[in-house]
């Protein structure tokens, strides 16, 4: 469906933004930038799609960058 397509695009864009270790944009701003009405909707959709919250994902990226 169209909604599924849009949400998949939003999550892919969130992953791209959160994968940049230099991006310190607050989650609330990322959520709003991607068109979510609430940060909880963003967190829930991200977690159901990726298997972790956006914050956990960002922290994991940071840890992996430090190891390199």
Question: Where do the language-model regions lie?
Answer:
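Residues within helix-turn-helix
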Residues: 25-29, 39-40, 55
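Terminal helix-turn-helix DNA-binding modules in bacterial transcription factors
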Residues: 1-34, 60-68
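Alpha-helical DNA-recognition elements
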Residues: 48-49, 60
């Amino acid at each position: 469906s169209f909604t599924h397509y849009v949400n998949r695009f939003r999550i892919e864009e969130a992953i791209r933004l959160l994968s940049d270790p230099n991006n310190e944009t607050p989650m609330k701003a990322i959520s709003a930038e991607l068109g979510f009405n609430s940060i909880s909707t963003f967190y829930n959709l991200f977690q159901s799609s990726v298997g972790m919250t956006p914050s956990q994902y960002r922290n994991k990226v940071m840890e992996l960058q430090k190891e390199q």
